[in-house]
Amino acid sequence: MNNLENIVEQLKRNRVVAYPTEAVFGLGCNPNNESAVRALLKLKKRPEEKGLILIAPTKELLLPYIDENKLTAAHWQIFETPSERAITWVMPAKKAVPQYLTGQFDTIAVRLCCIPAVIDLCERTGFALTSTSCNLTGQEPCRTADEVKLQFGADFPVLEAETAGKTNPSEIRDIFTQHIFRQG
C-alpha cells in the first residue's frame, strides 16, 4: 500500500477515493461531510433516495449512526458474528443521521469490514467510510486499482491494494427479520 498516506489525506480533505473491499473496489468518503457525500452521489449518478452503505472495522465507528435503543444483545451478536460472506446489515438509524446517508429510509446500512485496507483507512482517519461499488453507470464494478484508473482516469485517488478476493458483493440483510434484500 504505497500510497496509503495520500489516500488518508484525500479522505481527511473530504474527497472521494477508491479503495478495495471484500470483492470489488468501493467509492468512499467521509460520511460526516455532506459536500463529500454529494460529490460521491454525483460521480456515481446515484439517487440520494437509495441511501448508502457505511463500513468500518469496528462497531464503535458505526455507533454514531445506529439507534442502539432499538437493538437487543441478540441483534448485536448477529451483527458481530463473523461470516464467510460479507454481510451488510440494515439497522435502525439515529434520528440525527442525515438523509443524504439514509436516503428515503429510517434505517442505515452498515457492515463490519476487516480487510487490511479498510482497517488502515478507518484507523488513520478516525471515521467509517461510505461504500458503494466503484464503477460508472452501466460499467462493471472495478476489481483492481488499474481498472479504477481505466474507468475514472489516471489521476483519480485510488488505494493501491487488493480486494479480499470474494466473488460477490456483500449480502444485504435486515437485522430484525434476516430478510435478504440482496443476495451475496
UniProtKB/Swiss-Prot annotation:
Predominant location category: cytoplasm
Gene3D superfamilies, A to Z: DHBP synthase
Pfam families with a match to the protein in the record: Sua5_yciO_yrdC
Alphabetical list of InterPro entries matching this protein: DHBP_synth_RibB-like_a/b_dom, Sua5-like_dom, TC-AMP_synthase, TC-AMP_synthase_SUA5
Keywords for the protein's UniProt record, in alphabetical order: ATP-binding, Cytoplasm, Nucleotide-binding, Nucleotidyltransferase, Transferase, tRNA processing
EC id: 2.7.7.87
The keyword tRNA processing belongs to this UniProt entry's keyword annotation: yes
Catalytic activity: L-threonine + hydrogencarbonate + ATP = L-threonylcarbamoyladenylate + diphosphate + H2O
Top-rank lineage group of the source organism: Bacteria
Key word Transferase present: yes
Residue span, YrdC-like domain: 1-184
One GO cellular component, as annotated: cytoplasm
Molecular-function annotations in GO: ATP binding; double-stranded RNA binding; L-threonylcarbamoyladenylate synthase; tRNA binding
BP GO terms, sorted: regulation of translational fidelity; tRNA threonylcarbamoyladenosine modification
Locations listed in the record: Cytoplasm
Function: Required for the formation of a threonylcarbamoyl group on adenosine at position 37 (t(6)A37) in tRNAs that read codons beginning with adenine. Catalyzes the conversion of L-threonine, HCO(3)(-)/CO(2) and ATP to give threonylcarbamoyl-AMP (TC-AMP) as the acyladenylate intermediate, with the release of diphosphate.
HAMAP family: TsaC
Family named by the database record: Belongs to the SUA5 family. TsaC subfamily.
PANTHER family: SUA5 (PTHR17490), THREONYLCARBAMOYL-AMP SYNTHASE (PTHR17490:SF18)
Protein name: Threonylcarbamoyl-AMP synthase
Organism, as annotated: Actinobacillus pleuropneumoniae serotype 3 (strain JL03)
Lineage, uppermost ranks: Bacteria, Pseudomonadati, Pseudomonadota, Gammaproteobacteria, Pasteurellales
Gene: tsaC
